Amino acid sequence: MDLLGAHVSIAGGIHNAVDRGVSSGCGVIQIFTQNSNQWKGKAVSPADAQLFRDKLTASGLSHVVSHDIYLINLAAAPGEVKDKSLIAFKEEMQRCAALGIDKIVMHPGSHTGDGEETGIRRICEAFDQLFAEVPEFTGKVLLENTAGQGTNLGYRFDHLKSIIEGSSYPTRFGVCFDTCHAFASGYPIADRDGYRRTFDEFDSALGIDKLMAFHLNDSKKGLGCKVDRHEHIGAGALGLEPFRFILNDPHFKLVPKFIETPKGDADEMDVVNLKLLRSLVEG
């Protein structure tokens, strides 16, 4: 099973994402289900949902995950941003249920100066509300580790653990591990020893079975920079070795892996980056 793929565009209709993934050589795809820079997304019509499902079945793609829009901040204080965030994530869950997508990747959010403990509590409360309000979404939310910019939460594994354990629905969560974000937040995954120590820490905090997706991105900046800037595979500060480690780690053999690297014209760089990653697989 090919578990390497990319984030692909839904321009022209959500079903077009399937075609773009196939043409780029993806075995799996990640999508936004709406415009990522707008609060309000369109509901998916039954016809559009069926077309997406039919194309997906015919495509041979083994996994599709959604990524929530960047505007959402479930750690926000009560007010307009929090209200809009709850509505937007609820609509995301509803669209994914209609499309048959069972995993939503999301950035935990920013406490905006109110403190990490407060922000984490707000996230837990938000998800308790959302899971109860959208029973038709029976899948999982994958919390993505972050680079540690500003007051963003999720840059340490214990943040993710606290969200999962603080929710009334702990089994509804997994983790999406972003290599660029991990490195930028201070996890030394670029060498073998640091890689082992990082995933030992992950296993101790969360359990390795909670890791349900990877974002494979190189980093433009160095270890601990707290800057989220993705680079082509092998062209940044990470180099090729951490990707080789992940792709040949038996723990992650069945975990889907998505690139979010610069696209180039007509997505041709997705083809280049995926080809390079596949060349690192041993045996």
UniProtKB/Swiss-Prot annotation:
Alphabetical keyword list: DNA damage, DNA repair, Endonuclease, Hydrolase, Metal-binding, Nuclease, Zinc
Details of cofactor binding: Binds 3 Zn(2+) ions.
Residues binding Zn(2+) 1, per UniProt: H67, H107, E144
Catalytic activity: Endonucleolytic cleavage to 5'-phosphooligonucleotide end-products
Positions of Zn(2+) 2 binding: E144, D178, H215, E260
Cofactor or coenzyme needed: Zn(2+)
Bilayer-spanning residue ranges: none
One example GO MF annotation: deoxyribonuclease IV (phage-T4-induced) activity
Amino acids binding Zn(2+) 3: H181, D228, H230
Entry EC number(s): 3.1.21.2
InterPro entries: AP_endonuc_2, AP_endonuc_F2_Zn_BS, Xyl_isomerase-like_sf, Xyl_isomerase-like_TIM-brl
Pfam family, one: AP_endonuc_2
GO biological process, one term: base-excision repair
Role: Endonuclease IV plays a role in DNA repair. It cleaves phosphodiester bonds at apurinic or apyrimidinic (AP) sites, generating a 3'-hydroxyl group and a 5'-terminal sugar phosphate.
Entry-linked NCBIfam families: nfo (TIGR00587)
Family, similarity comment: Belongs to the AP endonuclease 2 family.
This protein's name: Probable endonuclease 4
Annotated source species: Citrifermentans bemidjiense (strain ATCC BAA-1014 / DSM 16622 / JCM 12645 / Bem) (Geobacter bemidjiensis)
